[in-house]
Amino acid sequence: PTQGSMLLSGIMLKMAVYGVLRYLLPITPLAIGGISGEIVIILSVIGIIYGALIAMISTDSKRLIAFSSLSHVGLIVAGIFASAVVTMRTGLTFEGGQGAIIQSFAHGINVVGLFYCADILYKRFKTRDIRKMGGLAKVAPKFAILFMIILLGATGVPLTNGFIGEFILLKSVYTYNHIM
């Protein structure tokens, strides 16, 4: 059910991010500064790419949102660990943690809104196939505008709630490695 997806993606995924920030980083800072942190960053980048590629070919609206969420959480984890590795090696500020908190909050709002909109669309069109959901702006223009605003926030367009956190996380990954 959609409510379960909203709960899992909007709140429960953020519990893992909180656990990493609150417990894992303070308990094992030296391991994260070494090869373990780099392995997590590489796996996170692989998760970002995998989630984005599967989301791009997906036609099921809930599946698309779920894999997009996987990609966002991969970015959050990559930003946290990249910033932690840079902090351990150079003593710079830990901005990835700040970006992770901001992005977790923004992503929680956006993904709950997307799942809610997907449920409304499913009830209207009786399908989750996005190829069969044309003409929404003609029948429900206010809903189409709201859906577009939520989509823009989820993609991290400037002047939306998803931009600030994504920018900070991408900056921390870029500080760690200019190629990634």
For each predicted feature, which ranges?
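Hydrophobic transmembrane alpha-helices and their helix-loop junctions in integral membrane proteins
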Residues: P1-M180
